[in-house]
Amino acid sequence: MFVAMSRFTVGNDMTAEVKEAFRNRPHLVDQAPGFQRLDVISPADNPDEIWLITYWSDENSFTIWHRSHKFREVHKWIPKGLKVVSKSVKLRPFHHVCS
């Protein structure tokens, strides 16, 4: 299993709108080959920080999705006016060891 974790911090007063957008997301990634699940989490001590954790059957499936047109399309539903703290955006790949 391959896991991709991405993080960003909301830089304006739109944290509630961003979280609501994730709750109502269009689920486009759900049909991607190899996709298993998406978790959206936020640290208790920093609610403006958003972590996206996607689980994939393999790294190649993630890479294909990440380079796809649909990946870019998914970002169209992000609330208009959202400002992200510069240098807060990070994507890290992981290999799942065990559960």
Tell what function each PLM region has.
Residues 3-8, 39-68:
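Short, well-ordered beta-strand segments in beta-rich or mixed alpha/beta enzyme
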Residues 27-33, 55-89:
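An amphipathic, aromatic/His-enriched active-site/gating alpha helix that lines ligand/cofactor pockets
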